[in-house]
A protein has these predicted regions:
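Glycine-rich loops and low-complexity Gly/Arg-rich segments
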Residues: 29-32, 41-43, 59-61, 93-97, ...
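Intrinsically disordered, low-complexity N-terminal segments that are enriched in acidic
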Residues: 1-83, 87
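Secondary-structure boundary elements
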Residues: 9, 68, 74-78, 84, ...
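Generic structural "secondary-structure junction" signal
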Residues: 17, 35, 61, 76, ...
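Low-complexity, flexible helical/coil segments
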Residues: 39-45, 52-57, 70, 105-113, ...
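Hydrophobic/aromatic-rich core segments of domains that either
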Residues: 6, 123, 138, 170-248
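Residue-level signal for pocket-adjacent positions within structured domains
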Residues: 51-54, 97, 156, 211, ...
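Short intrinsically disordered coil segments
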Residues: 20-22, 84-95, 219-223, 245-246
Length: 276
């Protein structure tokens, strides 16, 4: 799995990318990260650790044609889909993380959807949180039309609700915002998704239930058991695959590939699934 990003850099720029699988995703058997400007390697690329094993690469370059290539092969062992405790170590405290995942954020204005959510999902407060989250995810799946180009990087959950169309991040943002409005901690995970068509970076929702983060894909375009975590955050603002920190650059092309050497799992999009 991996990707190739192409940029036209028009003035000296600094970049941050989140394209390598998270350290929690599994054992890496082979990996390549190549960053070139006009065909020559870019030096001084540093890797930094983000939340939940995210790997952030920082680098700078001058004007020219920039290409970022990343390819990773994970070991054949299952990548931890069972329901169980979250990986320990330096992860955020459960209570603090739950509080953050309940608050409105840039693309998930849950505070504006409290009344709507209460009306659309009556009785949700008394239901099991995961059952409610599945109801929300199914509602988003039925309500929205998946349409490339129907939204842009400025569109939020409320915009998506009004337009009724979007792509994976829009589905995730609306699902997250509605879950938060119903009192369920929710966050976004960017992932590689074997089986996804058309192939691209993918975004799904995670909800916190009884101390475990469970994944929901409101697009239903890929089996959750095959997803490989890249980054995790409040919304797409925390999980962007590339950010221009300084300078000026235009993204020209994105190519993503992800496959598995085994038969893809069948997903009913109801049973609980936890990402590694």
């Amino acid at each position: 799995m991996g990707c190739r990003l192409s940029f036209a850099v028009t003035e000296p720029a600094r970049f941050a990318t989140q394209i390598a699988p998270a350290t929690t995703a599994g054992v890496v058997s082979d990996e390549r990260l190549g960053i070139t400007l006009n065909g020559a390697p870019v030096g001084d690329v540093t890797e930094h650790r983000g939340a939940h094993g995210a790997r952030i690469h920082l680098f700078a370059c001058g004007p020219g044609e920039l290409t970022v290539d990343c390819a990773t092969v994970l070991g054949a062992a299952p990548i931890g889909r069972s329901i169980g405790p979250r990986n320990g170590g330096d992860e955020p405290d459960d209570t603090v993380e739950a509080l953050v995942a309940l608050r409105q954020s840039r693309y998930c204005e849950s505070d504006r959807l409290v009344g709507f959510a209460a009306t659309e999902f009556p009785g949700a407060q008394g239901d099991d949180p995961y059952t409610t989250a599945v109801r929300v995810s199914s509602w988003v799946f039925e309500r929205l039309a998946y349409a490339s180009g129907a939204s842009d990087h400025l569109d939020s959950a409320v915009d998506t609700l009004l337009t009724g169309a979007g792509v994976c991040r829009d589905y995730a943002h609306l699902t997250i915002a509605l879950c938060r409005a119903l009192g369920i901690p929710a966050r976004l995970a960017s992932v590689y998704a074997p089986g996804l068509f058309p192939m691209d970076f993918h975004a799904v929702t995670e909800v916190l239930v009884a101390g475990v983060w469970l994944a929901l894909d409101s697009t239903r375009l890929a089996p959750r058991a095959e997803l490989v975590r890249i980054a995790t955050g409040r919304d797409a603002a925390d999980s962007a695959f590339a950010t221009v920190l300084e300078g000026r650059a235009e993204l020209l092309e994105v190519e993503v590939f992800a496959s598995s050497d085994r038969d893809l799992a069948v997903d009913d999009h109801v049973s609980p699934v936890s990402l590694a």
